Amino acid sequence: MGFFNLSKKQATTQSKPVSNSERTSGFEYLKRQDVYFDGACQSLRPQPVIDSLVEYYQKHNSCGERVKYQWGKVTDQKVEQTRDQVLKLLKLKKRDYFVSFTLNTTYGINLLLSQFDFKAAGIKTVVTSDIEHNSVFLATQSAATRAKLERLVLSREADGSLPISEIPDNSLVVINVMSNIDGRTLKNLRDIITYVHQKQGIIVLDAAQAMAHNYQLLQETEADAICFSAHKMYGASLGVMVVRKTLLENLNLTFLGGGMVDDVEKNSYLLSAEHDDKIHTAFEAGLQAWGEIIALGAAISWLEKLPASAKECLESCETKLFDFLKSQPKIHCLNQEKSTTFSFYVEGIDSHLLAEALSDQNIMVRSGYFCVHYYLDHKMHFPPLIRVSLGYQTTESDINKLITILRKFN
């Protein structure tokens, strides 16, 4: 990294060291010199979430929904509480929706699409957008091919909205609520949901990027399914599926295993999901990540109790970084507005080498195409990018440290 002509001494003397007291409560363990800008991949976990996971392993490690001993009862109660917390956070009614847990967002989307009965649902077209993460882009390719249906890739507007009039009748629409490139959000989300349903369609939302800082966008929406990851919203590693109960009518459940059945005979079985109180088992084959599920409950509680000052600090950091990136002639920033997620490249500098140089200064960013190969590489022909994604652990000192280094390239 010598050609960048940066030393740790230079970087640290030109920006104020981060005091742990500056950070939002829960991140006191983070070393002062460490600057984490990769929350779009996975967020750091606040201490209450870590404590919750440790408590499970140390105080009631047990298999959920299977045992009669006290540890198991504690686990069952806390897991059920987390399911309720997810629905409450999204302001969705338990009579209409259920919550299942899985590996991650990608896994959840694939569980839905791979078991979807397109003929029974009357679906004639699979629709997605150009800025989708590979979790959606590949899953919709596979689903359309399997069902022998047309797949339509619509172009999102600069503000993130989707052209509603271009969505055909009887479509399965799978789209993100917030981009992992530049944080643009689906501005006309509610109108799209209404339109798709009016046209006898079904809509599945990838909410992976939205849940940490923009979950309000999803509150009281009536999508058929919402998939997201706990590890992108300050929880432990876990996938979450929020599914409209009536959607099960259009699924042929073939990914089966323990915990999903009430009875099994030689050549037949009875699914537990046929009972409303066990409907969540439709997507929960085998033992689940009980500790991680409980830790998600702790993450939601932590998010809901965040003081206004934490949100104001994050917004201030977004503004400062956005204003800087857009003011630099040699930095090409993809963002049209501020966000927690920024992507850019510097003229004449390889982004992968820049990411390594920043790492030498204890600044952690992503470089590349961030699993959005089609849009970034093949459609827009961008070079590999740098992605900086902020979180509630971010301080103004973190932003200043990054800016101090990036100024050297202009």
What are these regions (language model features)?
Residues 1-410:
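Pyridoxal 5′-phosphate
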